[in-house]
Amino acid sequence: RPDGEAIDLDAYLRFATDRHAGVQGDASRLYRQMRSGARDLACLLLADLSLSTDTWIDDRGRVIDAIRDSLFLFGESLAATGDRFAMLGFSSRRRDPVRVHQIKTFAEPYGAVIRGRIQAIKPGYYTRLGAGIRHAAQRLAREGASRRLLLILTDGKPNDLDRYEGRWGIEDTRHAVGEARRQGLEPFCVTIDPEGNDYLPHLFGSGGYVVIRHPAELPARLPLLYARLTAGG
């Protein structure tokens, strides 16, 4: 209802994705009565910004453009719903340094400064996914929420210059995911790699990932996926 005390998460996310796609959504059902107590939830979104994201999807844009739009819509949606969240980007060139782009901390409000950081992201280097997950998990583990979701957005397999491709990268990433779970975190991977089903079950388990086969759909689907993952939380 339009004058409710709390925004309806599912309704708002659908409204926001429709608006992003140029469809005029119905704002009349966005609100609902606030449940007793706020959601005790924290989410950290970790985005792969490696050079492979410079690949063109079609004549309308590149993978990095879909990632940028996803971060914009994700940020707008979660800021409106009131859930606590942070956003990081990462890429790598061998073990050190792993480049970490601080897009939004948990303490920062979502606004013009954060939008500017999202706009400024650029692809570069490689995907040392295990290191990225460990860094993000360390930050998320500091949060005191009862549910802590680590949402990982990537476009392909772990890879780097120092033989990190293949079994080494896969096993390092699997160990990083296990370490995160032992800290009480909930890692979940969102990939646009059409071959993701070949290796992601080994890394995240059968229910720990989703493959989005059309990269252009990523901005609209990511907030809705978040709503499903956090339903009731």
Name each model-derived stretch.
Residues R1-L44, L49-W56, R84:
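Negatively charged sequence features
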Residues S50-G61, R115-K122:
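Glycine- and acidic
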Residues L41, T53-F85, A136, I170:
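…and closely analogous acidic/polar surface helices at protein-protein or active-site interfaces
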Residues A137, G156-P201:
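VWA/integrin I-like adhesion module and closely mimicked acidic/polar interface patches used
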